[in-house]
């Protein structure tokens, strides 16, 4: 287990560990416990470790070769900010079929890696990523299937604060791995700036 990237209470305050009342066999290894009300709770240390692993993996790519997507409303602003901070390409909102597979489509792009906010709501992007043979990094909750996911980050992928914090951490760690930020340097904007304003 790696050292925590931020204090435990900050992870807890953002609700990263709050899962759902369903679980899949794929996600079982990331579950810490089940509450008396049947809600599955994710292991924050495993989330932390997967953010580190995903950031290291993404840092092997040029920002322009990374595509981050979110159909889910609460993920759209975090994805936008992730792109602004790292230089990655983003598609917040509806993913148009053919974006990765149809060269005749006006907005056709050829990324080398996909970052998805939710394997279920971003399934079209993930299907196309698999069709063209690029790896998929995804934020995954307790009920997600990982069949088409190469690197899963176990997290509450429905929570506004949780999604924002994970994308903030990914951006920070990515820039640290690239040597753009020093090992102990933070982004010049707080995680709250990644949140969808309501």
Curated annotation (Swiss-Prot):
CDD domains cross-referenced by the UniProt entry: RPS2 (cd01425)
GO MF entries: structural constituent of ribosome
Residue ranges that the Swiss-Prot or TrEMBL entry lists as coiled coil: none
Matches recorded under InterPro entries: Ribosomal_uS2 (IPR001865), Ribosomal_uS2_arc (IPR023454), Ribosomal_uS2_CS (IPR018130), Ribosomal_uS2_euk/arc (IPR005707), Ribosomal_uS2_flav_dom_sf (IPR023591)
Gene Ontology, cellular component aspect: small ribosomal subunit
Keyword Ligase: no
GO BP of this protein: translation
Keywords (A to Z) from UniProt: Ribonucleoprotein, Ribosomal protein
Family (UniProt): Belongs to the universal ribosomal protein uS2 family.
Protein name: Small ribosomal subunit protein uS2
Gene this chain is encoded by: rps2
């Amino acid at each position: 287990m790696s050292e925590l990237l931020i204090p435990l209470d900050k992870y807890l305050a953002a609700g990263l560990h709050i899962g759902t009342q369903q679980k899949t066999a794929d996600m079982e290894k990331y579950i810490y416990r089940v509450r008396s009300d049947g809600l599955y709770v994710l292991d924050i240390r495993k989330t932390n470790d997967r953010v580190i692993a995903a950031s290291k993996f993404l840092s092997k790519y040029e920002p322009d070769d990374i595509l981050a997507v979110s159909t889910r409303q609460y993920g759209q602003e975090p994805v936008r900010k992730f792109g602004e901070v790292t230089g990655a390409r983003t598609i917040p909102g509806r993913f148009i079929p053919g974006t990765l597979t149809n060269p005749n489509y006006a907005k056709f792009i050829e990324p080398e890696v996909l970052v998805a906010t939710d394997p279920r709501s971003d399934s079209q992007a993930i299907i196309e990523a698999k069709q063209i043979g690029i790896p998929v990094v995804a934020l995954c909750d307790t009920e997600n299937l990982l069949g088409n996911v190469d690197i899963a980050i176990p997290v509450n992928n429905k929570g506004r604060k949780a999604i924002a914090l994970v994308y903030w951490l990914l951006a920070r760690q990515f820039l640290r791995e690239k040597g753009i930020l020093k090992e102990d340097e933070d982004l010049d904007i707080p995680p709250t700036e990644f949140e969808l304003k309501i």
